[in-house]
Amino acid sequence: VESMPDLNQHNPHLMKYLTQNSIWWIEYSGIDGIRMDTHPYVFFDSMAEWCKEIQNEYPDFNIVGECWYNTEAGSAYWQENSILDKTRNSHLKTVMDFPLQGIVREAFMSQTDSWTGLNKIYDRLALDFMYSDPMAVLTFLDNHDTDRFLSEEPDNLGFFKQAIAFLLTTRGIPQIYYGTEILMHGNKKESDGLVRLDFPGGFPGDKVNDFIAADRTPLQNEAFDFIQKILKWRKGNE
């Protein structure tokens, strides 16, 4: 669509409705978290109050804000208790680590020297001091709005395993985009739809069912088993 309607969230009656509506859906569905799309697009104070009210009602609930900035300063500004602006508080527990995501593919696919490769990751993590809570930052290799981590089907899983191991053992809250476990690949060059294809299997007309090992290729099973092993290890450790 060319445009979307705006709601005046400075209207207290509207904000009360939006907050009550959110609480109703959380209670009804039993979810434990919300990803708030384009979080910074709305009035800062309105979103801060919404986050605060939700957290007061559900202290263990998490809200992930899509704050798409290519710098740590841009992302960290929106996290609760930000050191970058102590005059106000967003009450947003988790922001997305787009600065790290933006360089992670190049970091693992290029040779490491003084400026490239894994040094790019070091440079990003060295700026963690900007976040009020780096452990609450959402880390990811890709999602529905970016190119997939794999632009094409790999011949081997060397750099892929390194990237997965890093994602699941570094600081923060890891997010794995569906299909990563079976090496789904593609980019947005022609269409966003190319990175949002259906997961093969379980749908009418699908020729393969990648939900089961028998239908996956040996390389897909290797990737699937590797991710599963690290996730089991992660789940069993603090």
Residue ranges and their predicted role:
Residues 65, 172-180, 238:
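Acidic/polar loop patches that form or flank catalytic/metal-binding clefts of enzymes
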Residues 150-154:
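Short, solvent-exposed helix-loop connector elements
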Residues 1-19:
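Chitinase-like catalytic core of GlcNAc-active glycosidases
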